Amino acid sequence: MVDPIVTKNWRDLIKPRGLVVDQDSLSNTYGKFVAEPLERGFGITLGNSLRRVLLSSLQGAAITSVKVEGVEHEFMTIPEVAEDVTDIILNLKEVLLQIHTNDVKTIRIEADGPKEIKAGDLITDAQVEVLNPGHHILTISEGGRVRAEMTARRGRGYVPAERNKIPGSPIGTIPIDALFSPIRKVNYQVTNARVGQQTDYDKLTLEVWTDGSVAPADAVAFAAKIVKEQLSIFINFDEAEEPAEEIKPVEEQKLNENLFRSVDELELSVRSANCLQNANIKTIGDLVQKTEAEMLKTKNFGRKSLKEIKEILAEMGLSLGMKLENWPPKAAPQGGAPKV
């Protein structure tokens, strides 16, 4: 058991207020995430770790081999088919799959011309989902016929064709190099974050692009879980339980003195100040109880004003959407709060 005094090594470090997701740009293939404030240096430490794990360690699915009836190797052509086998293989590499099992799955093409074969025409079972059904694979002319069988499975990272060879496969089976990773790109940026009057903390901004088989937020969560599991082996002690914090009755809790200040003291832009006045918001305590959605419904109040207010409140350790019991209190604290 570790001495409680020693635990101050990590408990005294500042932690992010939470992970903020940019809802305006969020999609099934892109996400932008912000974590702040972080201790100096932790932005690069966490950003680089998450980026490397995202790119290398998340599982995805891909086609790993193909066998086309009448074809012995990838440099042949198929009668009445516009693409040669090499082009068909390149197109198969770009088929996006989601496989809901760890088993190797079989996918087939059975078609007669004239017909354009797209990813949505692949014959699969219920455990295989094609995510880009409009993706072009090959074109069959009049009188043409294609019968092909492919294997697909889940995996991690990039696997060259040589490693996708299956012993005992029928003659004519062509292994395909596979990119299993569902992550297409990861960027991170570290800038300064402010806590009170100090500006030497880190702000981590992480951007993630995926192929759509995994949501960006889930991808970040999976990567963080992998890092956590890998680091757990280095912890060789149990922590002493901290004594439960005494919960004071609401009326005894000390409120942030800034809550009692007038919104006029925030030195907002004229537009933002007028919006608060029109909404009958007089004190900072009145303001912080409003949610972002409620503020955006205020006449002439836009996202620029929202950003301005959120940044000023953050400097005071406050935020929108707070719940203040018994507000306003019977008596405001004596003296004023310092200006921002």
UniProtKB/Swiss-Prot annotation:
It is an enzyme of class 2 (transferase). The keyword Glycoprotein does not apply. Residues 1-238 are annotated as: Alpha N-terminal domain (alpha-NTD). Residues 255-340 are annotated as: Alpha C-terminal domain (alpha-CTD). The keyword Magnesium does not apply. It holds the Pfam family RNA_pol_A_bac. Signal peptide: none annotated. GO terms for molecular function: DNA binding; DNA-directed RNA polymerase activity; protein dimerization activity. GO terms for cellular component: cytoplasm; DNA-directed RNA polymerase complex. The lineage of its organism: Bacteria, Pseudomonadati, Myxococcota, Myxococcia, Myxococcales. HAMAP family: RNApol_bact_RpoA. This is DNA-directed RNA polymerase subunit alpha.
